[in-house]
A protein has these predicted regions:
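N-terminal [4Fe-4S]-dependent radical SAM core
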Residues: 1-2, 182-224, 637-640, 646-650
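A short, flexible N-terminal coil/short beta segment enriched in small residues
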Residues: 1-20
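Glycine-rich beta-alpha loop elements in corrinoid/cobalamin-binding modules
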Residues: 2, 25, 29, 34-147, ...
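Radical SAM enzyme core and accessory elements
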Residues: 2-8, 46, 59, 156-159, ...
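Hydrophobic/aromatic residues located in beta-strands of well-ordered beta-sheets
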Residues: 3, 35, 89, 182-183, ...
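Conserved, mostly hydrophobic/aromatic
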Residues: 26, 61, 185, 231, ...
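A structural motif corresponding to the C-terminal lobe/cap of the Radical SAM core domain
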Residues: 57, 280, 292-295, 299-308, ...
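Radical SAM [4Fe-4S] cluster-binding motif and immediate context
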Residues: 206-360
């Protein structure tokens, strides 16, 4: 009998650790069981997935269900049942665990649901199906009996076929599918009734085998790893709050398994632990090992609560290779009333102190999260939270929108919060008592601008100037979102270069409006017209505001610090007057390398193509060296020079 565990991932680079864990555990308990894994993505053509499943000819198909793939999976299930009518289809995962009876009532093609953790439940299901197979039901695809034993064909799954009762006939107990002894399942009986049994016992994580015995198939993909399950916290929007039991895998197992990844030079290992640092000894044991055995390549991703870091943990982070680890830190809100209402325990002062400390090391990528749509948080309150988190200088600021997950405490408070949300996955907030849908739309626009202009990491110099121009960080993205909407730019896939052009036009228009305000407010002399203002010269001693020329320089810097671009934007200044200086610089580097020390064997013309020297409107030159890149951001090395005309010397500025 063939079992297929099917995972529909969001992207190709993702993998599904759940199905691998189920297979690994079942194989240790039932050696020889024929269990395959089929991994697909929601970007696959559904027809191709259907074809692949059909060619495998599984007798049992288990689908791993989440909010982002459940609709896709149910479409596949309905078609699979048409082409493989005898296949038993089971579902598992958080999206079906909390209303399993409703799912079965709604989806007649599904035989059953594995609720909660699935390793033990799936193994017992495999054993039950194999026990039924011992009666040698003929293979539904070839007509040949399983294991070569000729037996009379029976239809164990037909809804109208009467199954023998206990005690009827020889082997009566083995020729029917006996599921009543399996905890953690909700299933449809042969008569069509839906039955549900109590929860499955929780395994020790040490009982679950390491499922990455072979790295073939994981090339260029994120590898997921689990060193703990559960969460000690009770955040109302999260399913982890339901079970506060936290279990840890012994370090005696964890450390050799991490060495396996290091030996295979896996690019990234993402820990799926809900709060990785909730147990100090566990955290330090793993991090010390990674520091001592660093291969210089592998990056490890952790979800942490930064406010519970102690001095020893922070000092250890400071000793790490740049890029060895990255941290995802859930802040969600800085509104005290909101934090209290969602049952979140967080010391914002300690959190900020820890984030600032790690930032100062400049060796660890930090990803900070916010959630819009939480109780007691209106538009202005969320913007204050946004500004607070932005000022912590995260490498990425992730704006999420509340998902009302089945089984969560948040779902119970829908009426109290006047919470409206999408009726289909991912059940995202539409409005609350504090946040109307009109403000949700505004925040969606802000989210888009944050992704493009901040999280992309492609505008670092320009963002610093924008922070000077606007009073609050949030104003940058609010104004950009309004500009996109006003000019019909929203919802369009723009090229990288186009994003720079749009930002420049936005600044140009914004400064013109400010220019008009200045002119209107200026006192006009009786003998002449209004004073002529130009955006080029907007910087002045009174405001210290950057000029349009400053932004032009910063945008060119941001473009070249990422890559040696071939196409220049329309706002780029003419570089032809500086050909002589550029040529002389590279000739000097060829003769006596001072700055381009990694270009031995290349002549000045080749260097000029491999590196780039840009004249800026402030009179300086910036050298971009693409052989020297920042290990954290990936940006090219950049040095600013002043050219001393006549002396033909370059001085770093």
């Amino acid at each position: 009998m063939k079992f297929l565990l099917a995972a529909i991932n969001a992207k190709y680079i993702h993998s599904n650790p759940g199905v691998y864990s189920l297979r690994a555990f079942a194989r240790t308990k039932i050696p020889g069981a024929d269990i395959e894994i089929g991994e697909y993505t929601i970007n696959h053509q559904m027809d191709l997935i259907l074809q692949d499943i059909y060619r495998r000819k599984p007798d049992f198909i288990g689908f791993s269900c989440y909010i982002w793939n459940i609709s896709y999976i149910m479409e596949i299930v309905r078609d699979v049942k048409k082409v493989l009518p005898e296949a038993e289809i089971w579902l598992g995962g958080p999206e079906v665990s909390y209303d399993a009876k409703k799912v079965l009532t709604r989806e007649p093609d599904v035989r059953g649901i594995m609720r909660g953790e699935g390793e033990l439940t799936f193994t017992e299901l495999v054993r039950a199906y194999l026990q039924r197979e011992k009666t040698s039901v003929p293979d539904r695809y070839t007509g040949e009996s399983f294991r070569g034993q000729a037996k009379e064909k029976t239809s164990c799954c037909a809804e109208n076929t009467r199954m023998p009762e206990a005690g009827e006939g020889e082997n009566a107990h083995s020729d029917r599918l006996e599921l009543s002894h399996i905890p953690g399942i909700t299933y449809r009986t042969e008569s069509g009734e839906i039955e549900e049994y109590g929860p499955q016992r929780l395994l020790s994580l040490d009982e679950i085998p390491f499922y990455y015995d072979d790295m073939a198939g994981f090339e260029n993909r994120i590898v997921y790893y689990e060193s703990s399950r559960g969460c000690p916290f009770s955040c109302s929007y999260c399913l982890s709050s339901i079970d506060k039991t936290v279990r840890f895998r012994s370090l005696d197992l964890v450390l050799p398994e991490l060495q396996f990844f290091l030996d295979h030079k896996v690019p990234q290992v993402k820990f799926v632990d809900r709060t990785f640092n909730c147990k100090r000894e566990h955290t330090l044991g793993i991090w010390r090992y990674l520091v001592e055995h660093d291969n210089g390549i592998t990056n490890f991703h952790f979800e942490v609560s930064a406010d519970i870091f102690d001095e020893e943990e922070l000092e250890l982070i400071g000793k790490m290779r740049p890029g060895l680890i990255q941290l995802e830190i859930g802040v969600q809100s800085t509104n005290p009333d909101t934090i209290r209402e969602i049952h979140r325990h967080m010391d914002l002062v300690k959190l900020k102190r820890a984030v600032d400390r790690v930032y100062d090391y400049r060796n660890t990528h930090q990803h900070l999260d916010l959630i819009a749509g939480l109780p007691y948080e209106n538009y202005e309150s969320f913007m204050r939270s946004f500004d607070d988190v932005y000022r912590m200088r995260p490498d990425q600021l992730q704006m999420g929108f509340l998902k009302v997950l089945k089984g969560s405490y948040m779902e119970e408070q829908v009426a109290a919060y006047d919470l409206k949300y999408r009726g289909i996955p991912p059940y995202e907030v539409l409005s609350t008592k504090w946040l109307p849908y009109s403000d949700v739309i505004r925040l969606k626009g802000v989210e888009d601008m944050v992704e493009v202009y901040y999280n992309s990491g492609q505008f670092p110099a320009t963002m610093k100037l924008l922070e000077k121009r606007f009073q609050r960080p949030s104003e940058i993205f609010v104004n950009l979102a309004e500009y996109y909407e006003k000019n019909g730019l929203t919802g369009i896939s723009h090229s990288r270069l186009a994003r720079y052009e749009i930002l420049y036009r936005f600044l140009e228009e914004d400064m013109r409006e400010e220019e008009r305000d200045h002119v209107t407010a200026a006192k006009v002399p009786e003998t002449g017209g209004a004073k002529e203002w130009t955006a080029e010269k907007m910087e002045n001693a009174e405001t210290g505001q950057p000029s349009l020329a400053d932004f032009r320089d910063s945008l060119m810097y941001d473009l070249y610090v990422r890559e040696n671009i071939k196409s220049r934007p329309s706002f780029a200044s003419d570089q032809s007057p500086y050909k002589k200086e550029v040529r002389e610089f590279f000739m000097a580097e060829e003769e006596n390398p001072k700055w381009l020390t990694d270009y031995a064997g290349f002549d000045s013309r080749q260097m000029a193509k491999m590196a780039h020297l840009e004249h800026m409107e402030d009179g300086t030159f910036v050298l971009f060296d693409y052989k020297k890149r920042d290990p954290l951001s990936g940006n090219a090395g950049a040095v600013r020079f002043v050219y001393k005309d006549g002396e033909e010397t370059w001085q770093m500025k």
